[in-house]
Amino acid sequence: MEMMGMENIQQNQGLKQKDEQFVWHAMKGAHQADSLIAQKAEGAWVTDTDGRRYLDAMSGLWCVNIGYGRKELAEAAYEQLKELPYYPLTQSHAPAIQLAEKLNEWLGGDYVIFFSNSGSEANETAFKIARQYHLQNGDHSRYKFISRYRAYHGNTLGALSATGQAQRKYKYEPLSQGFLHAAPPDIYRNPDDADTLESANEIDRIMTWELSETIAGVIMEPIITGGGILMPPDGYMKKVEDICRRHGALLICDEVICGFGRTGEPFGFMHYGVKPDIITMAKGITSAYLPLSATAVKRDIFEAYQGEAPYDRFRHVNTFGGSPAACALALKNLQIMEDEQLIQRSRDLGAKLLGELQALREHPAVGDVRGKGLLIGIELVKDKLTKEPADAAKVNQVVAACKEKGLIIGKNGDTVAGYNNVIQLAPPFCLTEEDLSFIVKTVKESFQTI
């Protein structure tokens, strides 16, 4: 810890008091005073106002993909702010055009891009596009969406309705109509699913039971992230795509967390050989240096909106979505990922980190260690044979022990009652070998506290 003078200590204490008084840290409940107040950051490390350094093994909220302190991103935004600080996409500007083109390169297809600010907004946009698309194609009954239990898709009403986490919905219901849920794929708790693909078959049955003609689409993350890093069978997503095609539904892929290299591919769906109709993205698009999200739609969907009737157009406006500075910064962010081969680095470092954490399987409370790229989950259980989930208190002990040792890790809190039992790791791609060793050492030591 850096030395602090008495004046700095007093200023810091005052800052903590004001933080507790004025800033609502909703997920912390009654424990507002426990907040780490970040002051500066570089690479994978964050320094708080007490001068203490922490390795951020969650990239903020799964989003600072290229790491902290990249001055090139700040400079890209600054130069754009000087030239054109704002213009709405009711018209256009060069950074948005260039970024949309670049995203098409990354997606490997012919997509048209709608810009917003957050993952929740990107998913809300996708729902509206899908419903109107079917209407304009003459399918007037298609309004329902299928998602999976344990998945998270956002905190706005539509995105929360798609979310399969009851603890995130409780006290905010009733939510939007037309959202259905299927059991999630989870090869740890249901290893037979790798052969039977029963979790995909359930989506097929739901479409039949609900009447195919009423299903607008299926929304899914390639890997369920916030719900516990649930790994699907290899053939799962491809089968769901085939089911969607057979029933006339759209496949919407939520890449808000899995996208931009997090799983070791540009986008998570690329592991599974599918071509989604709609793709939503946020977080890593700017490495969180500025708010930006996008909803990418296949060109044939976009073409359905080109009619001349008064309500044929997509009547959806976003004031700040696709701001010039955010788009310019995103372009620089993607350029850095390309130039420094950070997606390959995510793949390689992720494989090494996952491999070194496998030793935790010997711990009596660890049931599974899993992941892809720099997206890793460690599931805690009471009993390895029955796989009964561990209490959240055990998870909290490990998280607290890591923080005390200078490591920030995540957990799947407030999701499904009884299943908040997964430690989560999603460090920045700029992680050094020394950083990786620190994560492994600290996590292993912290498990010795339970």
Swiss-Prot record:
Role according to the record: Essential for glycerol catabolism.
Keyword set, alphabetical order: Aminotransferase, Glycerol metabolism, Pyridoxal phosphate, Transferase
Pfam families: Aminotran_3
SUPFAM superfamilies: PLP-dependent transferases (SSF53383)
Superkingdom: Bacteria
Chain positions found as N6-(pyridoxal phosphate)lysine: K283
Disulfide links within the chain: none
EC number(s) reported in the record: 2.6.-.-
Name of this protein: Uncharacterized aminotransferase YhxA
GO molecular function: adenosylmethionine-8-amino-7-oxononanoate transaminase activity; pyridoxal phosphate binding
GO biological process assignments: biotin biosynthetic process; glycerol metabolic process
PANTHER family from the UniProt entry: AMINOTRANSFERASE, AMINOTRANSFERASE CLASS-III
Claim: Transferase is one of the keywords in the record: yes
InterPro entries to which the protein is assigned, alphabetical: Aminotrans_3, Aminotrans_3_PPA_site, PyrdxlP-dep_Trfase, PyrdxlP-dep_Trfase_major, PyrdxlP-dep_Trfase_small
Homology family: Belongs to the class-III pyridoxal-phosphate-dependent aminotransferase family.
Cofactor(s) the protein needs: pyridoxal 5'-phosphate
Record keyword GTP-binding present: no
